[in-house]
């Protein structure tokens, strides 16, 4: 696997020098300063590429080129946004970047209720609390129809949870959910947020699938002409939330996506932390079945909590519910299969997220993206990979 690291650009508190010292060789980056939907010019791409390469690193993967909301709803200027997206892909390819991660999640990117969940060892992790989220939907946002998404027991627990919240806690929970996260342009007031949700009224899972298939059908000729691979990131969490449809959550969703848009340029990001939240997702089976379409991997683990099967926190990389041993073995099997047919390029892998720990507890960090937790995760995965390669792949 190619060892990569997500970098949020010049304003990231983790520097390129830090990243190189961590042992990564590839950078995962995006031009976050360009508004969603606007074309990334070659000038801007090359400027960022030069900054990365000046430190002896390679811009390996773009994560992400954001998909404008009007593309997802097929409203407004969606065709113009698609045309802009195509031009951005052309520009990236002509600048030597050939792998682009993206997602098709409506309104929100990855969603958590707690960005500073304290672990038993004192480190801090990201967490999704089903009851806290229900309290937000039912009693803070007051989304019409939200009751249908929760059991009576969950509704009662959510009311108790809400009644025990201070005003500061209400504001913090709201901010965690709707104010946007690193790499996301969106940040909403409650009223604006509900208005965004309302845009999806009447858009079912099947309809959103139609919109995604149309989007990809428009992009594939550009991707094929330039050898540029798209790698869709799964929904996070991988289930419907806020009354919104989700269409990249299960192996059945991947089956549909690869059958509907069969081009080899229509690929996947295997994010074990996202897919792994669902107990019914067999990650190794997913990798073995769709390995040839995996162009990017995010390796992290989550732990479902006993209090509620929908509640989870982000575990250490080799802990939690993800069987990282067999996941890495399956990825190495795919790399070997490719090598046997002449494709020796390693699959880019980044240690996704990481606990805030040690000296980073005293610093301002991007949620999930502090340096030391990811350094630990990368070192652990690197060691696991080396052991597997020497035991099973050295001839």
From Swiss-Prot:
Keywords, A to Z, come to: Iron, Lyase, Manganese
EC number(s) given by UniProt: 4.2.1.8
Name the domain of life. Answer: Bacteria
Q: Which GO terms describe its molecular function?
A: ferrous iron binding; manganese ion binding; mannonate dehydratase activity
What class does this enzyme belong to in the EC scheme?
lyase
**Any one of the GO BP annotations:** D-glucuronate catabolic process
Record's keyword annotation contains Kinase = no
- Give one Pfam family: UxuA
Q: In which pathway does it act?
A: Carbohydrate metabolism; pentose and glucuronate interconversion
Cofactor(s) annotated in UniProt = Fe(2+); Mn(2+)
InterPro entries reported for this sequence: Man_deHydtase, Xyl_isomerase-like_sf
Question: Reaction catalysed?
Answer: D-mannonate = 2-dehydro-3-deoxy-D-gluconate + H2O
Please give the PANTHER family that the UniProt record associates with this protein. MANNONATE DEHYDRATASE (PTHR30387:SF2)
NCBIfam families per the UniProt record, alphabetical? PRK03906.1 (NF003027), uxuA (TIGR00695)
Q: Which family does it belong to?
A: Belongs to the mannonate dehydratase family.
Function statement: Catalyzes the dehydration of D-mannonate.
Task: Please identify the protein, giving its name as recorded.
Answer: Mannonate dehydratase
Q: Which species is listed as the source?
A: Vibrio vulnificus (strain CMCP6)
Gene designation: uxuA
């Amino acid at each position: 696997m190619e060892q990569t690291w997500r970098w949020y650009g010049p304003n990231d508190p983790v520097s390129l020098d830090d990243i190189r010292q961590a042992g990564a060789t590839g950078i995962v980056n995006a031009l976050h300063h360009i508004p969603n939907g606007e074309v990334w010019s070659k000038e801007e791409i090359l400027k960022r590429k030069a900054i990365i390469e000046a430190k002896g690193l390679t811009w390996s993967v773009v994560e992400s080129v954001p998909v404008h909301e009007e593309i997802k709803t097929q409203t407004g200027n969606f065709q113009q946004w698609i045309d802009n997206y195509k031009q951005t892909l052309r520009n990236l390819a002509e600048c030597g970047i050939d792998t682009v991660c993206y997602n098709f999640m409506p309104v929100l990117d990855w969603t958590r209720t707690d960005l500073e969940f304290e672990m038993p060892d004192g480190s801090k992790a990201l967490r999704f609390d089903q009851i806290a989220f229900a309290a937000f939907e039912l009693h803070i946002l007051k989304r019409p129809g939200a009751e249908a998404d929760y059991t009576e027991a969950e509704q009662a627990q959510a009311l108790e949870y809400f009644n025990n919240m201070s005003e500061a806690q209400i504001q913090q929970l709201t901010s965690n959910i709707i104010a946007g996260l690193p790499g996301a342009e969106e940040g909403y007031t409650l009223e604006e947020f509900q208005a965004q949700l309302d845009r999806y009224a009447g858009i079912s899972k099947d309809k959103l699938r139609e919109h995604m298939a149309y989007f990809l059908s428009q992009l594939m000729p550009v991707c094929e002409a330039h050898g540029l691979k798209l790698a869709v990131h799964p929904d996070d969490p991988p289930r419907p939330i806020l009354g919104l449809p989700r269409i990249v959550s299960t192996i059945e969703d991947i089956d549909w996506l690869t059958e509907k848009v069969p081009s080899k340029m229509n690929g996947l990001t295997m994010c074990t932390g996202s897919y792994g939240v669902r107990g019914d997702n067999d990650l190794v089976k997913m990798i073995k079945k769709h390995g040839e379409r995996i162009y990017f991997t995010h390796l992290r683990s989550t732990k479902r909590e006993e209090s509620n099967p929908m509640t989870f926190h982000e575990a250490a990389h080799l802990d939690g519910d993800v069987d990282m041993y067999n996941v890495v073995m399956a990825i190495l099997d795919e790399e070997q299969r490719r090598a046997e047919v002449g494709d020796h390029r390693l699959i880019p892998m980044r240690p996704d997220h990481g606990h805030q720990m040690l000296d980073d507890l005293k610093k301002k960090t991007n949620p999930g993206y502090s340096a030391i937790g990811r350094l630990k995760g990368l070192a652990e995965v690197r060691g696991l990979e080396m052991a597997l390669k020497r035991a099973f792949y050295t001839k």
